[in-house]
A protein has these predicted regions:
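Hydrophobic alpha-helical bundle cores within soluble ligand-binding/oligomerization subdomains
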Residues: 1-283
Length: 283
């Protein structure tokens, strides 16, 4: 990225995971097993978050501190209790969410004997899509471009015109609203001095909901909480990926215990123009 541009942290984490790995499950076991490898991954990702602020270089976590504390330090923030509370909330709320595409990717890799770093790397590759953590980056990019009431109105009008069909609003799993997003947005509203970025985003959420009635997704909740605590751009997708990583590690270990391959099956069917269409079904 340019010097003043935030890196896409999911891609940074993916590169870090693959650089730290590269061995086999046997080598992982000889190195002490999955727990040391998991700790190495999570702490490395925390150190990578220093790329979001200050001199934009890796900062190795030091001392026996909670993960949220390491993250605050990496992003150039004082580890105040209120910040640690919201960081922990974002990590916990992001940790697991059914069998999402990234989680399924991690489990498929684990089922065929990939080592831990490779399983997490596979999941991160899926998470980087704009329909998932990439959605946080898109919201932050749009928010950064909103510098007037007219630009905010145009953003609201665009979303309303599309009936809020975006990665920011509406999720089939929660027809009454995503409770993860609701909690994070409430925390953002409760901040005594949320700042301009958060205020603009919260007005955007309120106006879209008033016109369309579609509740926000976790992406908006993460960006709102990060903006309220003045975390640097890119922090929302980074925190989502870090929370998810803990879940993927657990899924990887569980899948290994199952002892069978996850192999989706495919059937070819005649297409409308005479070609073949592959329809897949997980088994």
């Amino acid at each position: 990225p340019e010097p003043d541009e935030a890196p896409r942290m999911v891609r940074v984490f993916q590169a870090a995971a693959l650089a730290l790995g590269g061995g086999s499950v046997d080598e992982e076991v000889r190195g002490g097993g999955a727990v040391p490898a998991a700790r190495q991954l999570v702490l490395a990702f925390a150190g990578c978050c220093a790329l979001l602020s200050g001199p934009r270089r890796y900062r190795a976590p030091t001392g026996a501190k909670p993960l949220a504390w390491h993250l605050a330090e990496a992003m150039g923030k004082e580890a105040a209790p209120d910040l640690l509370r919201v960081l922990n909330a974002m990590l916990i709320l992001s940790a697991d969410h059914e069998l999402s595409p990234p989680t399924f990717s991690a489990r498929i890799a684990a089922s065929v004997g990939a080592e831990l770093h490779a399983c997490v790397g596979a999941a991160l590759a899926a998470l980087s899509g704009t329909g998932l953590a990439g959605g946080c980056d898109r919201i932050e990019d749009t928010l950064a471009a909103v510098r007037s009431r007219g630009q905010l109105d145009a953003w609201v009008a665009r979303v309303v015109r599309d009936r809020a069909r975006s990665s920011a609003f509406g999720i089939e799993s929660y027809p009454q609203g995503d409770p993860r997003a609701a909690l994070l947005i409430r925390m953002a509203r409760e901040h005594p001095r949320p700042g301009l970025r958060a205020g603009t985003l919260l007005r955007f959420v309120d106006e879209v909901q008033a016109r369309v009635g579609v509740p926000p997704r976790i992406e908006l909740g993460l960006v709102a909480a990060c903006a309220a605590w003045d975390l640097p751009p890119g922090a929302a997708s980074a925190l989502w990926a870090m929370g998810r990583t803990a879940g993927w590690i657990a899924h990887t270990l569980e899948q290994r215990l199952n002892g069978f391959f996850l192999r989706p099956r495919g059937q070819f069917h005649a297409g409308p123009q005479g070609g073949a269409v592959l329809k897949s079904q997980a088994t």
